[in-house]
């Protein structure tokens, strides 16, 4: 009997990676021996994907929310065997936590994310994996760093406060004494620099509620903060990926000497994807829309690259497909949920039904290819 590794991303907005795996197991058994390995790229579904693969414990902490007068119950994943905490910034400082009409990156803070890191450090974490997708903030991680004991003072010696508005006021930096602090790895798949035309404010602040005038103020604040950091210790903060999560990538890389990794790469490593793949005969992967971006750092592209490396054939099952399998080495076949028998609207309304229908065809294809 052929063993199949089911290693999908979520089908965004419809099915989690775990749900995709469960449906695949239900359809393909008992003819095939399937192993579920749900994945993520550091964005939506990261904690669930890791929890499905490793023996983790959910920790819930009441922390500062993205708005100054807001508290939230945010959870992170504790992996005792690895002495590692996996934290999603969006759980404490995410855009979905901000009520409609109140989005404002000039006041939104990442302080709550810092409180989660503090909780994990006190628990004994040696490693912290920090996924920074989905943020409401443009504060360069100042809030997070304040929660860890950093002080950012204005020209009068007063705290600059929270949010993106604080960046332009920073005149003095006072670091804390952090003894035996965990190694922090940032999971990030965007390549934007700290400031400028492709920087944090210009590209992402409009999605967080900033009008054009606010975007300019935020960008100027990031430029000012970069100068202050350069004068403080010579660190050049305007590098690729520094603009992720409103400048969080740059802020924590500077202050905490973090590593910044591709979200998929870090999660694949943590969940030992290559070892799981090596023990299987075939890999089935998939996502909501398989397009020209998929091979570039996304989950499906990463899975295909790994499968090619260790010479494993693959099948793609996607909500929609905009790439031909002829340009993809080692891909046997691509199955799209949307087709003549399954219009897009119906597939979105009934994703479980659409996925089951295609997986039945996958099963028939595999049985025929064995004969």
UniProtKB/Swiss-Prot annotation:
Record-level GO BP terms: organic acid phosphorylation
InterPro entries, per the entry: Glyc_kinase_flavodox-like_fold, Glycerate_kinase, Glycerate_kinase_RE-like, Glycerate_kinase_sf
Protein family according to the UniProt entry: Belongs to the glycerate kinase type-1 family.
Keyword RNA-binding tagged: no
Keyword Protein biosynthesis belongs to the record: no
Alphabetical keyword list: Kinase, Transferase
Gene3D superfamilies xrefs: Glycerate kinase, domain 1 (3.40.50.10350), Glycerate kinase, domain 2 (3.90.1510.10)
Name used for this protein in its record: Uncharacterized protein slr1840
Domain of life: Bacteria
GO MF, one annotated term: glycerate kinase activity
């Amino acid at each position: 009997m052929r063993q199949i590794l089911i290693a999908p991303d979520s089908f965004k907005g419809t099915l989690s990676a775990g749900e995709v795996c469960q449906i695949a197991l239900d359809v393909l058994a008992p003819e095939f021996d399937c192993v579920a390995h749900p994945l993520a790229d550091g964005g939506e579904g990261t904690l669930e994907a890791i929890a499905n693969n490793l023996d983790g414990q959910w920790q819930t902490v009441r922390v500062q929310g993205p708005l100054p007068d807001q508290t939230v119950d945010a959870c992170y994943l504790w992996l005792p065997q690895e002495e590692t905490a996996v934290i999603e910034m969006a759980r404490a400082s995410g855009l979905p936590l901000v009520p409609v009409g109140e989005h404002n990156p000039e006041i939104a803070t990442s302080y709550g994310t810092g409180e989660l890191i503090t909780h994990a450090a006190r628990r004994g974490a040696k490693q912290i994996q920090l996924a920074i997708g989905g943020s409401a903030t443009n504060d360069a991680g100042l809030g997070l760093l304040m929660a860890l004991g950093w002080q950012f003072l204005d020209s009068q010696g007063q705290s600059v406060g929270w949010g993106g508005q604080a960046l332009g006021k920073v005149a003095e930096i006072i670091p804390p004494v952090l003894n035996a602090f965990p190694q922090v790895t940032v999971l990030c798949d965007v390549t934007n620099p700290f400031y400028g035309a492709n920087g944090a404010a210009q590209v992402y602040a409009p999605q967080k509620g900033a009008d054009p005038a606010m975007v300019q103020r935020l960008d100027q604040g990031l430029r000012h903060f970069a100068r202050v950091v350069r004068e403080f210790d010579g660190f050049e903060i305007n590098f690729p990926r520094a603009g992720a999560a409103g400048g969080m990538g740059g802020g924590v890389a500077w202050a905490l000497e973090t590593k910044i990794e591709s979200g998929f790469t870090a999660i694949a490593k943590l969940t030992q994807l290559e070892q799981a793949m090596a023990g299987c005969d075939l890999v089935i992967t998939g996502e909501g829309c398989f397009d020209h971006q998929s091979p570039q750092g996304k989950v499906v592209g990463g899975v295909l690259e790994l499968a090619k490396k260790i010479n494993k054939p693959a099948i793609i099952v996607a909500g929609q497909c905009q790439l031909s399998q002829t340009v993809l080495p080692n891909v046997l076949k691509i199955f799209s949920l949307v087709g003549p028998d399954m219009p897009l609207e119906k597939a979105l309304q009934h994703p479980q039904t659409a996925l089951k229908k295609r997986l039945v065809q996958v099963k028939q294809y595999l049985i025929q290819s064995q004969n």
